[in-house]
UniProtKB/Swiss-Prot annotation:
SMART domains: IG, IGv. The gene is CD8B. Phosphorylated as a consequence of T-cell activation. The chain crosses the membrane at residues 171-191. Integral membrane glycoprotein that plays an essential role in the immune response and serves multiple functions in responses against both external and internal offenses. In T-cells, functions primarily as a coreceptor for MHC class I molecule:peptide complex. The antigens presented by class I peptides are derived from cytosolic proteins while class II derived from extracellular proteins. Interacts simultaneously with the T-cell receptor (TCR) and the MHC class I proteins presented by antigen presenting cells (APCs). In turn, recruits the Src kinase LCK to the vicinity of the TCR-CD3 complex. Gene3D superfamilies: Immunoglobulins. It is found in: Cell membrane. Its main location: membrane. The lineage of its organism: Eukaryota, Metazoa, Chordata, Craniata, Vertebrata. This is T-cell surface glycoprotein CD8 beta chain.
Length: 210
C-alpha cells in the first residue's frame, strides 16, 4: 500500500480529538483571497526523529469526514508534498518546537479545518485544528455612531449702546452755564445785602454809645 493511501486510511480510522501534545494557533482565521496564511503547530514533546503531517478537512469533523494530506516535515528531507497539491503554494518549515504550514495565494476552495498530526505507535495524535475561511472581501468594522449633544443657547444681555459724539449738546452746556451765573449773581447779592445790614447795625450801635 502506498504511504499516502495508508496515511489517509489511518486518519479515517482514528478517533479525532484535540491533544495537548500538539497546540495549534490560531484556532480560527479569516483572510482575503490571494493572501498568505501561516498556521502554527507547537509540539510539547521531542520530535527529533519524527515527522509532522498537515491535513485538511473541508467539512465539519465527524466519524466519516475526509482528510486530505497536504505535506509533511521530515528532519532529514525537509518538506515532502502530496502529489495532489501545488508545491509552490504549500510549504512546511520548522522554527524550534513550532512547525509552520505556509499557504500562499489562497482561494475560497482552500477553506477548511487544518490539522497537524504525528504518527505514533499505535495511535495518531492530532492538534485541535485551525479553521481557515477564505473570502473575497473582508467585513468592515462599523464605526460606532456618536450622539450629537444639542448646543445650549446662551442668552446674552443687550449691551448698552455707547453714545457717539460729544456727551452734552450746546443747548445743555448753555443751560448749565446760565445756571452757574444765576447762582453766582444770587450769591453776590446775598453777600452785598449781608454787608449792608452789618454796616447799618454798626452805625446804630455807635449812635447808642455816644
Amino acid at each position: 500500500m502506498r504511504p499516502r493511501l495508508w496515511l489517509l486510511l489511518a486518519a479515517q480510522l482514528a478517533v479525532l480529538h484535540g491533544s495537548s501534545v500538539l497546540q495549534q494557533t490560531p484556532a480560527y482565521i479569516k483572510v482575503q483571497t490571494n493572501k498568505m496564511v501561516m498556521l502554527s503547530c507547537e509540539a510539547k514533546i521531542s520530535l527529533s526523529n519524527m515527522r509532522i503531517y498537515w491535513l485538511r478537512q473541508r467539512q465539519a469533523p465527524s466519524s466519516d469526514s475526509h482528510h486530505e494530506f497536504l505535506a509533511l516535515w521530515d528532519s532529514a528531507k525537509g518538506t515532502i508534498h502530496s502529489e495532489e497539491v501545488e508545491q509552490e503554494k504549500v510549504a512546511v518549515f520548522r522554527d524550534a518546537s513550532r512547525f509552520i504550514l505556509n499557504l500562499t495565494s489562497v482561494k475560497p476552495e482552500d477553506s477548511g479545518i487544518y490539522f497537524c498530526m504525528i504518527v505514533g505507535s499505535p495511535e495518531l495524535t492530532f492538534g485541535k485544528g485551525t479553521q481557515l475561511s477564505v473570502v473575497d472581501f473582508l467585513p468592515t468594522t462599523a464605526q460606532p455612531t456618536k450622539k450629537s449633544t444639542p448646543k445650549r443657547r446662551v442668552c446674552r444681555l443687550p449691551r448698552p449702546e455707547t453714545q457717539k459724539g460729544p456727551l452734552c449738546s450746546p443747548i445743555t452746556l448753555g443751560l448749565l452755564v446760565a445756571g452757574v451765573l444765576v447762582l453766582l449773581v444770587s450769591l453776590g447779592v446775598a453777600i452785598h445785602l449781608c454787608c449792608r445790614r452789618r454796616r447799618a447795625r454798626l452805625r446804630f450801635m455807635k449812635q447808642f454809645y455816644k
